[in-house]
Amino acid sequence: VVGGDECNINEHPFLVALYTSTSSTIHCGGALINREWVLTAAHCDRRNIRIKLGMHSKNIRNEDEQIRVPRGKYFCLNTKFPNGLDKDIMLIRLRRPVTYSTHIAPVSLPSRSRGVGSRCRIMGWGKISTTEDTYPDVPHCTNIFIVKHKWCEPLYPWVPADSRTLCAGILKGGRDTCHGDSGGPLICNGQIQGIVAGGSEPCGQHLKPAVYTKVFDYNNWIQNIIAGNRTVTCPP
């Protein structure tokens, strides 16, 4: 996250870090939505993925941190683009449910969608500098706004006007998600409204907001997958 500050240690109990068994680098974020399921972006998938919950600082452990491996990973079966970026959403079922604790708790799925002008919060362990490869020891947070979708369409050819995405940022620039924040949540009014999908390079440029998968449109898919209906397709 560029243009942010260290998150409050108690404001992100649902935020998870994704890395692999072969690398301790956090390549993506994600969000815990119940004791057994994590929501993230499809492009965050890796072999040998690991999920760390209850983490704040990479160096100073929270006493209630937990690590999990996937029992299953679920994607949209009906993507239009071969890379699946038009439906950039993935559900990870944890091999063992987590125990909720001080720093581990779920975030609610959206009860309604949020419109242009809504103020939302972004968070993650991604890059904090637009010019250098600086990654923080702690997650950074900041507030951005949902903006008109037309700002994103020319920037990201895989997000047509009818795509189930949100365009969000600060039009004058300066505050944005960045490398390593992918898959993390866009939180509006205490609910997860978006998943970090893609952005411009470098991050936080003037008139270049980022694109987020619109979670509200996938509520039905998410609930079906969790309920055990594996044949459900994502909205077109």
Swiss-Prot record:
EC numbers on record: 3.4.21.95
Keywords, sorted A to Z: Blood coagulation cascade activating toxin, Disulfide bond, Glycoprotein, Hemostasis impairing toxin, Hydrolase, Protease, Secreted, Serine protease, Toxin
The keyword Disulfide bond is assigned to this record: yes
PROSITE patterns with a match to the protein in the record: TRYPSIN_DOM, TRYPSIN_HIS, TRYPSIN_SER
Parts of the chain that traverse the membrane: none
Glycosylation sites: N229
Annotated GO biological process: proteolysis
Domain Peptidase S1: 1-227
Pfam families in the record: Trypsin
Entry GO MF terms: serine-type endopeptidase activity; toxin activity
Reactions it catalyzes: Fully activates human clotting factor V by a single cleavage at the 1545-Trp-Tyr-Leu-Arg-|-Ser-Asn-Asn-Gly-1552 bond. Cattle, but not rabbit, factor V is cleaved, and no other proteins of the clotting system are attacked. Esterase activity is observed on Bz-Arg-OEt and Tos-Arg-OMe, and amidase activity on Phe-pipecolyl-Arg-NHPhNO2
Keyword Glycosyltransferase: no
GO CC terms: extracellular region; secretory granule
Misc. remarks from the entry: There are three isoproteins of RVV-V, designated RVV-V alpha, V-beta, and V-gamma.
Function field: Venom serine protease that activates factor V (F5) in a calcium-independent manner. It cleaves the Arg(1545)-Ser(1546) linkage in the human factor V molecule. Induces the coagulation of mammalian plasma.
Protein name: Factor V activator RVV-V alpha
Organism: Daboia siamensis (Eastern Russel's viper)
